[in-house]
Amino acid sequence: MDIELSGGRLRYQEVGSGPPVVFVHGLLVNGDLWRKVVPVVAGAGYRCLVPDWPLGAHSVPMPRADLSPPGVAALIAEFLDRLDLRDVTLIANDTGGAITQLVMADHPARIGRVVLTPCDCFEAFFPSVFAPLPRFVRIPGATWLLVQALRLRALHRLPLTFGWVAKRNPPADVIDSYLMPSRISPEVRADLRRFVAGVHNRYTLAAASRLGDFDRPVLLAWAREEKLFPISLARRLAAVLPDARLELIEDSYTFVSEDQPQALARLVVNFLGATT
């Protein structure tokens, strides 16, 4: 399905019926990140909306969109407005969690509750291993070089690619769905560059200073073995948010929806059942 927003056309999938649940993935992945979780949540009686946000693995470029972190947060808010979604549950991961915190701080009206899985927050936007990326992509040709280098599957287990976000390699077709759009489309690559170049932790730090006003329930479903976003960050979020609880997921890195989808889905369904 497609929807026309002020910044361009956004592609999304919709599964199930009931109270709305909107999924927010991170950088260089798309809605396929949630493919093992959505059927369980939809089967429990929820309307799951799974957009491909313009973060580098989307198939429809958005050249007119403001792709700064606040701009993408506004895009999420516009998506909720255009579909007139109310009492929405946002479920976010990785970079998408940082953007979701901006939505919570600046556009909370339609949000009923939030699930944050391991994600950027506070000063860790990006985490230290990825901190050079905003400067790097400003070098002419650097984004092209980056996405072409990711052709080499041997690189996919390195910390700078998928090695520290997933304990288990996603299937080859899923990896291709993540990496092919920016490899073959200059317009998607330009979107990717614009977003990455605009990342700065001033956004997440500013959002964190306002999260104390977000009084709706928040589940922090964090990976115990998290390498990029240590549990200490989750505990800091829990201390800032008025109604948050932390649950730890075993045997997983950042992509808990990839490594432990059933465990995540159980936590989500139980949380929704207790708060909707």
Kindly give the residue locations of the regions a language model identified.
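Alpha/beta-hydrolase fold catalytic core
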Residues: 1-21, 43-46, 85-86, 250, ...
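Conserved beta-strand scaffold positions in the cores of enzyme catalytic domains, especially
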Residues: 2, 48-50, 93, 246
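Flexible "cap/lid" subdomain of the alpha/beta-hydrolase fold that forms the substrate-access gate
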Residues: 10, 27, 56-87, 91, ...
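Conserved HGGG/HGGXW glycine-rich cap/lid loop of the alpha/beta-hydrolase fold
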Residues: 13-58
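A conserved mid-protein helix/loop that constitutes part of the nucleotide-sugar donor-binding site
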Residues: 32, 232-235, 262-263
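Hydrophobic pocket-lining residues within nucleotide cofactor-binding pockets
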Residues: 53, 249-252
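Catalytic histidine-centered segment of alpha/beta-hydrolase-like enzymes
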Residues: 252-265
